[in-house]
């Protein structure tokens, strides 16, 4: 083999190696660009999912959990005063009747209205929905009794006891959703 043939063979060999490296680099670059594009899309989808989750939690908290929780908490603060309806002291009895009429019943009605309007936000928790419906039923019976003019009979007297599990269930759900909301906000802001 002559020098010229060896030189031509070396040039062709180097050109083929260069071409092979260029083709490999081209495909590697395309793969990396596609990978970056997929990663970017996945990150964007995660941001959108997180944002939607934040919006849903915010709606649940602001339209259902916190308002119902606060109405129930207000009931907890004053309900014992209505037990004085049967007091021998006329001032205490009148005060209890007025608290029941002007505060407890409207407060119950407001809580029921919130529940009725926003039950769909109750996170499809069948146990919580059942407890909330017991509360709504209790309030309906309570209102019906008072609408008849009867101020002596309580819902318990007609087989409709107060659902003692309503406040703990709402409190637990509210605090759980609030914690989840704050965690998502913190993660989303980073």
Regions picked out by a protein language model, each given a short descriptive name:
Residues 1-48:
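Membrane-embedded hydrophobic alpha-helical segments
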Residues 31-190:
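Conserved non-transmembrane functional hotspots
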């Amino acid at each position: 083999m002559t020098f010229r043939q060896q030189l031509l063979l070396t040039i062709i060999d180097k050109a083929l190696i260069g071409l092979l490296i260029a083709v490999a680099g081209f495909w590697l670059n395309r793969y990396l660009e596609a990978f970056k594009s997929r990663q970017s899309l996945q990150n964007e989808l995660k941001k959108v999912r997180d944002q939607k989750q934040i919006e849903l939690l915010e709606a649940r908290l602001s339209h259902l959990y916190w308002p119902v929780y606060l109405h129930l908490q207000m009931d907890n603060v004053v309900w014992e005063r209505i037990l004085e309806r049967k007091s021998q002291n006329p001032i205490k009895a009148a005060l209890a009747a007025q608290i029941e009429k002007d505060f407890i019943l409207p407060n119950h009605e407001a809580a029921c209205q919130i529940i009725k309007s926003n039950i769909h936000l109750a996170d499809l928790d069948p146990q919580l929905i059942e407890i909330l419906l017991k509360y709504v039923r209790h309030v309906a019976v309570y209102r019906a009794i008072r609408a008849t003019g009867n101020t002596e009979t309580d819902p318990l007297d007609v087989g409709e006891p107060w659902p003692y599990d309503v406040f703990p269930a709402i409190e637990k759900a509210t605090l759980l959703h609030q914690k989840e909301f704050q965690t998502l906000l913190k993660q989303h802001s980073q």
